[in-house]
Each structure stands twice: as C-alpha cells, then as structure tokens.
Amino acid sequence: MGDVKESKMQITPETPGRIPVLNPFESPSDYSNLHEQTLASPSVFKSTKLPTPGKFRWSIDQLAVINPVEIDPEDIHRQALYLSHSRIDKDVEDKRQKAIEEFFTKDVIVPSPWTDHEGKQLSQCHSSKCTNINSDSPVGKKLTIHSEKSDAACQTLLSLPVDFNLENILGDYFRADEFADQSPGNLSSSSLRRKLFLDGNGSISDSLPSASPGSPHSGVQTSLEMFYSIDLSPVKCRSPLQTPSSGQFSSSPIQASAKKYSLGSITSPSPISSPTFSPIEFQIGETPLSEQRKFTVHSPDASSGTNSNGITNPCIRSPYIDGCSPIKNWSPMRLQMYSGGTQYRTSVIQIPFTLETQGEDEEDKENIPSTDVSSPAMDAAGIHLRQFSNEASTHGTHLVVTAMSVTQNQSSASEKELALLQDVEREKDNNTVDMVDPIEIADETTWIKEPVDNGSLPMTDFVSGIAFSIENSHMCMSPLAESSVIPCESSNIQMDSGYNTQNCGSNIMDTVGAESYCKESDAQTCEVESKSQAFNMKQDHTTQRCWMKTASPFQCSSP
C-alpha cells in the first residue's frame, strides 16, 4: 500500500529529463522583501511613445488568432497538479501571504507625485499667503492675504460609505479663510508688535499714536521720539505726515519720566535721520520770566523736545547736515547720571561745524548723538552733559548771545542779574567767565537759568561765556532747557569773545583747561576742537544765567 500511495504522489513531466517549470518572478526567499516598495518611480505606469517607430511586429493577440495552437486539457491538468504537489511549503507560503497583506495595508501602492515635494509645496503655500504691510504707515498696518487653492490628485486608501457625513467631522478643522479675521487691531497680540512697542514695564508705550491726541503729555511725547529713531524694521517711512511716531522702532525701551536710553545694541554705523517736517506745533516751557507771556513758535522744521515734566529729549538730531554732522558732544568726557547733588537746566548752542575731540571714539559719536553713559569718576555734584539739537526757520534775524555765566550766589534771580551786570570781576572770581559786555538793544528777551530739583535734568561742562554775532548764518541755539530755537541761513559766522575773533577759550573753573580755536576755511565752515583735561566742581548751589538779545524780534504767536 505504501508503494501505491507513493506512486500516486509522484507525477513525472511529460518529457523525462526536462527542467521543472518555475515562476521566474519568484524565489525561495521572496517573502522577505514582498512588503517593501517595489516601484522606483510613479512614471512606470506612463505609456511612452518612441519618436521613431520600430520594426512591425504582430502582437500576442494577433498571433493567437492567426496561428492557433491546440492545447490538450489533460496536459493542463497534469501540469497544474505537478506544480501544486511539487512545492508545497506551508511556512513559506504563510510568510508570503503575510508580507503581501502588509504591503497592501501599510504602504502606498503607487507613490503620489506630491509625496516627494512636501517641502517645496509648503514653501509655495507660505509665499502665497504672505502678508503685505502698508509701508506708508508703520502703525496702521493692513494685512492683505492672498488665499490660493491648488488641487492635486493622489492615491488614498481611505474608503468611506456613501452616506458618510464628512463635513460634520472635518468642518471644525477646515477653514478656508482662517486668516481673514486678522485685522490691524489684532496685531497688538503678536510677538513682533510686542517687541517693537512694549516698554520696559511690559505695557504699551505712551509714544504710540493710539493715545489721546488731546492730552498734552501724549502729544509732546509723540514729538519727542519723532526726530530720531533707530529703524530696525524693513518698513520704510515714506511720509512724515503718515508717520506720527518714528521712535516706536527704537531698540531701547522707553521709560516713563526719568529716561535712560540704553543704546548698547546699536550696530548701525550711521543712524537714520528723522524727517525734517512736523505738523505739530510746540510750545516753549514756562520759566520765571516767561510765565507772563507764552510763545508758540510755528516752525515746520523744528520742534521742542520737552515733555510735561520739562525734561528735554536728548534724542534730537539736526537733519540738515548728514556727512558733516553738527556738534554731538561739547566735551570728551562721557556722560554719567548721579542721584545726588544739584541738577541743572542748561542750554547748549549748536553751530553747523564739526567738533573734533581727542580720547573719544568718532564712530561712537556718530552712532550715539546723545546718551547717558558711564564716565570716569567725578564729584558728587552730579554733572551731566546733554546735547540739544533744535532747529527752526527764520530769515533776517540778527542774534547776539551777550553773556553766559555760572555763579554760586544764593540770592534771588533779580539780585543775581544786577550783581552780574555791575561787577563782572567778582563773578570771574566765583568761577564765572564773562567775556563780553551786554549789548544794549531796544527789544530784548532775557532768560535766567536756576537750579531745579528734578534729578534727571543735566548740566553741561562747557559754559564759557562766548558771544556770537551772527548775520544771515545757519545757527541753532537753545536758550532754555525747554529749547526754543531760532536758526538763520547762509554761513557767515563771526565769533567775538571780547579778546579776539579767532581764539575763544577761557578758564571756566579752577581745574578746567579748555582750549578752543576756530578755523575758517574757503567754504566758510568752522571746526572747533575742544580739549577738556579735568573737571572739578564744588558741591554748592549754582545758578546759570544766560542773556540773549535779538536785534529784531522773531515771529511768535501768543496763545
């Protein structure tokens, strides 16, 4: 019986010695890579036409019709039975079926052409949905979104029933106009706006134009940061009328009243100059002699850098001269803020010629027009330097600064004025330099500087009494800390110090050596070189006086 069964199981091919028929696409270990991706490119399924047709060949279907072959069904049955009994291996077949099932359930049958270009497609979508910012106004930013849709067909293995409600499930996640609700008002919550407009306390700065325009503090604060800004934004301010606050792009946070401008992060070699036109009208601050009549200087080219507390803005720069900048610092001594001592409110005269000082970095002076930086050790008097660059536009005005002096008397303002006019020598003994006699002019305006208690008011160390006789020249002077300004035009400057017209230097205090000289070139420009060696001052109450006389009154309006 065993031999009979064994003979039934053995099926020999029709021709003895013939190689058994095998599937050329299969191998004994093909189950190990059946689940892997076999298609190298989706272009396999594309039908390509050759440019030159080859030789004519009959197709298989045509040959079957032309030359039919008679196949015995018994031969087919025998060969099928042989193939089924010759290679029976349950383990290998199970592995193959498992690999085939894994291939059709987990992997993509045909790779989609969009699969290999995900990064490129994302970049295209990002560029098509970029925001266009209105460059005319950096504050009123308008968000414009170009919503573009691109359809692409790809293969999916997801099967859904006919009555499946896809909108209820994916409706919350699919929003075609999800960026349409972003308005300029909602931009305040973005991180970029917080970096630009938040001050050190974490709140929106008062310099934003969203503040009430009727309040004097917001209006003056807006004017303070108008004239100088360190622009770190790619948005360009085209019109100053549409840019009410260019200081909002300042790299340093703006504090409340006691301002300290930390400009340590400045990397730009040449700060961007501010616009030269301002529609805001400014008002001269009140002093003991100007309380009775208030002047409002209407000038499109000047501003008063004074806030409600009377603090003069240091970040004011003359926009007329760029390469040959005005005086940026009156002394090579650096700035330092002390809490103790008496603070002073002084004025500085700005003349359009270059100040060359030794011991100070020129690039630092160009980048930082006025700032509060630590300086070498000084006395507790709290001496500070502050530069004021204020400009206005008047024509045909003859300005004469008759005296600028420092005294240490404790009397009232009127007594000090009379004492200074009567006894000049006594004032010089008290560390006062008066180099010219007062010029009697019919219409004159006198300002007297008195010490104040505000700890943030600075004082300059270059207070030598120099008289400038200017006729049709471009000159900016600030007789008050509130900075009312009167410039002229042309460039003919005569400097009369009482001794000569070329060398105008004197000893200001006991240990101050100041050497100043003026050189006139063919282009009628002046260069002043100031060398300050030491500065020592007693801790006494000091009153600075400045008399300013005008040959013809400048135009002003009383509110």
UniProtKB/Swiss-Prot annotation:
GO cellular-component term (any): meiotic spindle
GO molecular function: protein kinase binding
Superkingdom as given in the UniProt entry: Eukaryota
Keywords: Cell cycle, Cell division, Mitosis, Phosphoprotein
Location of the region described as Disordered in the Swiss-Prot/TrEMBL record: 1-27
Residue numbers carrying Phosphoserine: S183, S191, S270, S325, S331
One biological process term in Gene Ontology: cell division
Post-translational modification Phosphothreonine, affected residues: T354
PTM annotation: Phosphorylated by AURKA.
InterPro entries: Aurora_borealis_protein
Annotated family: Belongs to the BORA family.
Subunit relationships: Interacts with AURKA.
Function: Required for the activation of AURKA at the onset of mitosis.
PANTHER family: PROTEIN AURORA BOREALIS
Protein name (Swiss-Prot/TrEMBL): Protein aurora borealis
